[in-house]
Amino acid sequence: MSIYYNVFWTASQAENAPLYKRKLQKGINNFVFTAYNTIVEEITITQNGFDGLYMSYLYGKVRERFSFLPAECGLEKQGERTEIAFKTDGEYCPYVRKFLQEHIADVIAIGYKYEFFKRRLSLPLLSGEQKRLLLTALVAADYREDRAYVAKRLCGFEEYCLDGVFHFRLQELKRRWENIADYVPTDMTESSVDGFIEFLVDDGEGKLYIKNGKAYDADYRLLSRSLLTGVQSPIGEVLLGGAEQVYCFGEVDDRTRAFLKKYYAAKAVFC
């Protein structure tokens, strides 16, 4: 917590995604279950409230990752409740569950946390863009620790209820977020935001690539976690990726270029 005290408290003294209708498809890849002796299992994810962004994100991820499996995957919204149902051969379910737990952890450690700070912090002296940068940086600062903590709390579930897990099994995490928010002064200024982002950049590790407006990790996997903050962008991916160096190929939009030149300087390479 001393990080937030040093950066914010000291500085302050100086100054949808669209929802899908239920569409239970006969196999993600148009496969059908033909092995009658196969034990089919169902993995269910539910959420009450919110605008469906997180569930649409998870639905897209699981469909894309397991498109090769004989499976059924559906997304349904009924009033305030949204449900994802994934059915496949029982032998594949441990792999699907592990994948979903990792991405549910992303939803909470990024999406829920961003929304938490957005509601908790007013920050009247910051522009909309500066506030978005700060909120994303706050999420990124403890992203790996938060994600690991959430993933552990998801083990052993037959069904995953996002809001239920968040409100009843992650109270310690919520208290940590409250403590962080208490260190952020209402009169936060742009220079304080700059100082915090510069601190994160100095503490970064590894590499991240941007090619034609899309971000990739060190293993060249396409990144889309910033979508969980409501807007997918290279800048969001850079902050959430926690990279020490950024390599850019092809066209780079003016906003991303300005961000990298300001905060990364020589650590950003334009090829």
PLM region descriptions:
Residues A218-C271:
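C-terminal structured domains
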Residues M1-Y4, Q25, F31-A35, Y263-C271:
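Short amphipathic alpha-helical segments
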Residues I3-F8, I43, G206-L208, G242-F249, ...:
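Hydrophobic beta-strand segments of well-ordered beta-sheets in folded domains
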